[in-house]
Amino acid sequence: MNVTSGMDQILAQLKATSDLAAGGSKPSATVSTVSQADFGQLLKSAVDQVNTVQQTASQLSREFVGGNQDVELHDVMISLQKANVSFQSMIQVRNRLVTAYQEIMNMQV
């Protein structure tokens, strides 16, 4: 599973939960297509993948700066951009989780 598909699944679950909280309607078909993996496991897996991408980018960068002739500049730049995009995506997921949590906490019982 790549970072994008994991985050898509998380966002689909968040949207379905938000729809349920807002309208009290039945879960959408999106929820049933999401794998039966635990939400916490999906989130942990996505965070681990982002961490791996960042570590790889950092390692390539260190090797390039250290003078390793096998590491090309374009490989370093691509790796750094992948790490940046995956980290920014994770930040957006975190922001949506916080917003969803705040909405749930503000609901009247």
Swiss-Prot record:
Q: Which UniProt keywords apply?
A: Bacterial flagellum
Q: Which GO terms are recorded in the biological process aspect for this UniProt protein?
A: bacterial-type flagellum-dependent cell motility
**Compartments (UniProt record):** Bacterial flagellum basal body
Q: Read off the InterPro entries from this record.
A: FliE (IPR001624)
One GO MF term: structural molecule activity
**Pfam families attached to this UniProt entry:** FliE
Main location per UniProt?
other
This protein's source sits in the domain of life called Bacteria
Q: Which family does it belong to?
A: Belongs to the FliE family.
Do you know which HAMAP family this protein is assigned to?
FliE (MF_00724)
| Identification of the protein by name | Flagellar hook-basal body complex protein FliE
Gene (UniProt): fliE
